[in-house]
Amino acid sequence: MKIPSATILGTLLAAATAMAAVDPGLLNLVMPEAKILSGVQVAQSQASPFGQYLLSQMQINDEGFQKFVAATGFDPRHDLNEILAATNGDHRALVVGQGVFQVDRILAAAAAEGAAVTNYRGIDIVTSPDKPGSTGSIALLDASTAVMGDTDAVKAAIDRRIAGTSFSGSLADKAKEVSAVNDAWFATVTPLSDFLNGKVANPNLNGMTQGNLLQAVLQASGGVKFGSAGVTISGEAVTRSDKDAQSLVDVMKFLASLVQMNKDKDPLAAKAASLADAAKFTADGPVMHLTMSLPEQQIEQLFMPLAPKPRRTGVALR
């Protein structure tokens, strides 16, 4: 039986979309009280033109990097597939990754560098030797899954893995939705003012986070898609009302205009202005949308180092 080419194409596109979504196994490892999730489809991103550009900028000849790869057998350029990070908003974060890990080799390399290796429920936990009393740890749950965070967070993730718990709810649903159409993404269903309260060191900025506008943002999400011809950035903020969404659009447009007004002051401001110029803000009911498309050449230029300022020669005027 001959299958129509349109059916084959549709199936491939659907499969590609499904593959792009956050891995359920990684999602189930995050803490149940997580407030913000973010992730990167590393393998997909690296395959894009921009991903190849970033790889070309890596210092692969660095002695420390080569020593790390030789000792562990792990090369992040092609052994890392996906990263998922979660935080509960209380200075506790957990990072989980999917890739190819040579467990015994990595553990041996860590021990050789002085790291403490302890066993918890059949899984070895490696604790950093950098500082006395350090609580930064990493555990390899199997040859394809890694967990990193403070020791208690890593142990809790191991507990969830063994218990077979699942992460569900509105944040999980939003994460699946956003990650399915982006290579790098974030999602939160917590009001921004709640999450930022007391987290900003500057008292003036901390006060701004509690302003009426940010209090109106009930949840937010966004992402970056690396395409064959450039990069697309998108985001949305769900507010309390249609009026709040439009007010947020107006504020974002005003801030973008301020950035553009200062573009001639220094090269960094000029780079920011190019982003502001490409940004489009719209309101659809209580939701504010951001879209931004940048061609490959422009996005690469944004990541190029700034040229050093010319030095004064010290020649006196006559």
Predicted regions span which residues?
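Intrinsically disordered, low-complexity segments enriched in Gly and acidic/Ser/Thr residues
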Residues: 215-283
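Bacterial N-terminal signal peptides
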Residues: 7-16
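Short cationic amphipathic helices and targeting signals
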Residues: 36-38, 91-99, 144-149, 233-237, ...
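A conserved glycine-rich beta-strand in the N-terminal activation segment of trypsin-fold
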Residues: 135-196
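Positively charged n-region of N-terminal signal peptides that target proteins for export
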Residues: 1-6
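A short, solvent-exposed beta-edge/loop patch
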Residues: 134-161, 227-230, 280-299
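Short, solvent-exposed coil/turn segments at beta-strand boundaries
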Residues: 90-92, 101, 120-123, 139-146, ...
